[in-house]
Amino acid sequence: YKLDTTTGVEITNQLDHANGGLQYLSRSDWTGTWPTVDGEVSDQISTWGNPINGTDASGKAASYTYRKTISKEDLAKLDSFDSLNTTDPSTLTDELVYGKDNGLGLIDMRGLDYNDPKWNDLLDQLTPSDYQTLITQSGYGTAAIKSVDKPSTTDRDAATGLVNYGVDASGNFYFKGNITHCGVIVLAQTYNDDLATHYGENIGDESYYLDVDGWYAPAVNMHRTAFSGRNSEYYSEDPFIGGHIASLECEGVASRGMYVFVKHYAINDQEDHRGDREGQYSIATFLNEQAAREIYLKPFEMCVKSDKVEMNYAKDNGDGTYSNATTEIPSVTGIMTSFNRVGYTWAGGNYNMITGLLRNEWGFHGFIITDNANTGVFMDAGQMIQAGADGKLTNLPTGARYTFNKNDVSDYHYGREAVHNILYTIA
């Protein structure tokens, strides 16, 4: 297709930066693209069936692994906070507006389209402190924002239900109860649309009793191998089955007024070498556009394009009165990004992945949050908002690692987009 069948946007390559400069096997030239040995022979015996290429200490024929040393140029890419956003900051001309008194509350935005002009009036009421809070402290919920009468929200984790315990900002442990359903692998193997929808509806119903607003799920990464990280959270090795069942689950959850964060966007394949400590890089994953779109991104695309659900709201009649009204909203208004890098660039700060593909091509509007940024110390909030994502999953002040610059046009421009996305989902 030349155009996206849902949005009508022209489809262009977004992941050329992620192919690693490798030659990929292709049916168009089976012989010419067949993989060959690359690198230099190491001193480590292979356990993966490498061809015999030497002898061991006793003189017997042996197979050694090959190794490559990363170049200084590529190492610098890993160490960079470049979001791949090519916009020149000097071309941004936003007028800096904070703290206006327009008399609006977040409840007034419920039921309005993402692009309704009224959003600008609401966003003008926010203060620099509001920007800092929403961008850097959105882990497991968002804080109350007085300037727009926004209540606090609670978001909870677990791919099979709601895990409602943790440590609050004061370091105190709390427990409010957990509810867990069957594993999603079992759900996917039923091929039962009604059951998948009811699965989501049940979780949405349970959110009322646990005072939960958002759900860090479903998780739609692939069963690439039996040894991939967190396979128990993911549906299938088949992207269509995973995407279809998860989409129905999202529709069920959203029909109850709860918002989801479909995760981990994207190409999240393991839970080792995530970059959980100072001085660590997260793992860099290389692949081509075809593999990404047909396999690893397909479940996310299906969820984002799933059916809309009805939402009730109080409609402002413009004469001081309100009436009950119903509108349709997307089933998916939240995405959680991943620890890993797509190519050399962190997935949660990757402009091509987030703005180029998710927002522009697929038409996604809503809250994009990082994975656990309390431990993901490399997750830079500046890179994140420049890429088109919105909030860090941190609930500890030390997790911010970013200060919103109220006088910087670039910070304001991307920060305003970020808080708009967050508030749209919550409204």
Which stretches of residues belong to each language-model region?
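Glycoside hydrolase catalytic-domain context in secreted enzymes
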Residues: 1-427
